[in-house]
Amino acid sequence: MQVDTQRAVAQALGSSIASTHQLTGGSINNAFAVRLDDQREVFVKTNPGSDPRMFPTEALGLAWLNTAEAIRVPKVLAVSDSSNSSPAFLVLEFITSASPASDFAEQLGHGLAKLHASGADGYGLDHDNFIGTLAQDNAMCATWAEFYGVRRIEPQVRLAVDRGIAPTTWTQTFGSLLTRLPDLVGSEEPPARLH
């Protein structure tokens, strides 16, 4: 972890850093297990080139998921948006890996069902966020089909076409799909709390 990030994390947590260990598994951010001088262990994500809104909106999303008290969601301990020349980072409680219990899949299923059933204010969210490094519009829509079509599928198709990754015919093909989406997805469900 870069020295300026270590200093900023230590200042945000009120404790010096004793050690850092880079973790693997992600492709967008750098991830570290960090032991503090006060013996706490935390998880730190960094990304020097990230959009300044990326980590703050992730922190908002994690807090929103936590309010349902349905599944274990890491608590946000500190966040920096890279303003004022401070490095961008997100500090979460460290959850130690363990072998799953024999009924883990069942417990996870029940927890996710409880999370989804805890509801949401509508089909959308009160703030925009990111899918990877791509900005994601979460403005409310009248139905789930409209939200999924207009806020998820359409922007990704447009981006793929604009970047030359997909042929321009996709615009028309997916446009046709989006007009039929309400019929394809079936009966309307109430808004759910999704990650």
Question: Model-derived features: where do they sit?
Answer:
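Residues at helix-coil transition
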Residues: A117-A120, R158, G186
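Active-site acidic catalytic loop and adjacent metal/ATP-binding pocket
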Residues: N30-R35, V76, Q172-H195
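Short beta-strand or tight-loop elements
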Residues: S16, S27, R72, P190-A192
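Active-site catalytic-loop/activation-segment of kinase and kinase-like phosphoryl-transfer enzymes
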Residues: I131-P182
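Juxta-kinase regulatory segment immediately upstream of eukaryotic protein kinase catalytic domains
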Residues: M1-S19
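ATP-binding pocket architecture of kinase catalytic cores
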Residues: H21-E146, V150
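Generic structural marker for isolated residues within well-ordered, non-membrane alpha-helices
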Residues: T5-Q6, L62, L178
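Alpha-helical structural context
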Residues: Q11-A12, A68, L184
